Amino acid sequence: TGDALFIGDVGRPDLLASVGVTADELGVMLYDSIQRKLMGLPDAVRVFPAHGAGSACGKNLSTETQSTIGEQRAFNYACQPMSQEEFVAVVTEGQPAAPAYFLYNATLNKQERDVRDLDAAVPALTADQVEAALAAGAVVHDARDVQEFASAHLRGSINVPADGRMAETVGMVFSPEQQVVVIAPEGVEQEVATRFARIGFDHVVGYVADPEAYFLAHEDDVTRASRLTV
């Protein structure tokens, strides 16, 4: 069911509002998809949504990965019998703020795109290559945990740890066309680049092969921070 019908929720009709299509107009289309088409299917039909909880694509996404039309008819708030006006009102209110990259993704999803080769290795960058990338305007994404980042990091780098909802956060603080140099725990570099790619950010140029050695050789570019628990 893609991003139309989730388990416990339905898709957001507000993500293309800034390109001339209102949330109400898309809500009417969603009503037709959910109430008139999907809810017309037998209860036993199995439901496999595009994804589950862990994103801002809805306000009540389940952690389950599959369901049935019957279960959604019984328990999904948006699948209950209601008028078109009621449906549009209920699915447009109370939505979390959409990350900035959502509109970019919604537009990108309508275009023909090359399939990403997940086996293609992320390049390990030498010190000279890192310096050249930074001089050309690349930004540094430091994917280490916050304590390691605080102990030493490149001035101007942005710390978004690889654990948790990294992709959603980097989508808020990076722009899609920015060249990105990654500093990450050993063995995690490929995963970081893949998570960038999942939101359409395809410009990870490589990773710093040995961060500690790079920091020692570029001490003037390294800064430290203290942490405060509140």
What do these predicted regions represent?
Residues 35-38, 131, 171:
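Generic structural signal for well-ordered alpha-helical scaffold segments
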Residues 118-129:
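A contiguous, basic/glycine-rich beta-loop/short-helix subdomain that forms a polymer-engagement track
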Residues 49, 141-142:
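General beta-strand structural signal in soluble alpha/beta enzymes
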Residues 1-95:
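Metallo-beta-lactamase
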